[in-house]
Every structure is written in structure tokens, then in C-alpha cells.
Amino acid sequence: MARRAISLIDIDAYYSDSHVLQRVSFTAGEARVLGLIGRNGAGKSTCMSVAVGLLPPRAGAVEVFDVPVTRLPPESIAAHGVALVPQGRRIFRSLTVRENLAVAARASTLGATHWTVDSVFAAFPRLKERERQLASQLSGGEQQMLAIGRALVANPRVLLMDEPSEGLAPQIVADVARTIARLKGEGLSIVLVEQNLRLALELADDIAILNSGRVVFLGTTDELKGNDAIIARHLGVY
């Protein structure tokens, strides 16, 4: 059995008085991809916010490699090896591609050097070709590559990816998929929030389905593929 990389355990979370996560539990194993899927508004991005310390839970626990990190500030959770690629491609639009990566690398407190600015360029040749361009001049797909690269130069052990394929052309989605598969092969643990069900099933080893803030399915990808009723009921597709 894979070592537990990141776990949410019986999480209750609120936005003001709205109970948005109810006893949510799931674990991403070491060097495995956990696909976190569900309809819009199910609570997937909220789980990401809880995991990285942006939204402290009202109850429950977050653990990184069995170390409790619940209610630690985001920078402390990052120091335990957790990085987030958020929705919206949060990059410094007024900096060049190289400057974006260099700033993220300098901010890392982990000390590892597996991923450097140059190794990101090797993984994403398009970024190398545009290293002196402002991030604001990149296409949407290139900005997503840059957001992933910024997370990687922190050299995390756990990578959380929130809708990495959203709004991208099929060719760029294929590039992102290859990168995720490569990262898993290199031992990185990944939690993947993904609306593209086909992509999620292709990349994930394990699946958690959220519906109205609750986990309604937790199992392997193969187990979900054999359960059309669950897919139809909670995702609205066959």
C-alpha cells in the first residue's frame, strides 16, 4: 500500500454560515494521482483551499505524510512540501516568463533542487522559446504551463492542481496530461481537480467524487469505471 501523502480527515468547512464541506475524508497516496471530481459547486476547490491552509476547517484534520498541519498558515504547509496550481493561472503578468519562475524558486523553503528554472524550460519548450516575454503576452495554454512551472520550482512532494485543463486547446491538454504522468512517474503525489471526466479517468489512480460537500464515492479508477450508475447519478454522464 502506498504511503499516505496528503489526507483530509472528517473535514467540516464553512463559508460564513454556509456548511460547504461535511465530514470529507480522502487520501492521496505517495506517487499516485487522486482525481477529485464532481459537478460545479460540489466543493472540490474548497477542499484545495482547506488542504493548503487558505480556509481553516471548523472540524477535522489535514495531514501531510502523517504530520498534522491543520490550521497552519499557508506558508507553513508549503514548507511541508505542498504546492497548489490554482484556478485562474495566478502568475505575475508584468514579469517575464523567466522572472516568474525565478521568483517562485527563490520563495521556496524546501531546499530541494530537482526542479529548476532550466528543467522547467526543458519540460515545457514553449516556455523556453518565450522566456523573455511578459507573462501577459502568453496564450492561455502557455500561462497554464507557467503556473505549473512556478509550482514545480518549489520542489514539492505533493502537488494540488485545480482544473489544469480548463479552457485549453486539445493539444495543450495533451501536453499537460503528459506532464502529470511524468510527475507521477518521478514520485510526486498529485491531487487533480478536473471537470474533464475522460482526462481524470485517464490520469488518476484513485477517485473521490464530491456531491454537495460530501464524498459520495471513494475508490480506484477501475472501480469507478465499472459503476455507470454512480457516474450517471453524481456526474450526469455515462
Label each region the model flagged:
Residues 151-152:
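ABC ATPase C-loop
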Residues 60-69, 80, 113-115:
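Conserved ABC transporter NBD signature motif
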Residues 37-39:
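The feature captures the beta-strand-to-loop junction immediately N-terminal to the Walker
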Residues 159-163:
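Catalytic Walker B motif of ABC-type/P-loop ATPase nucleotide-binding domains
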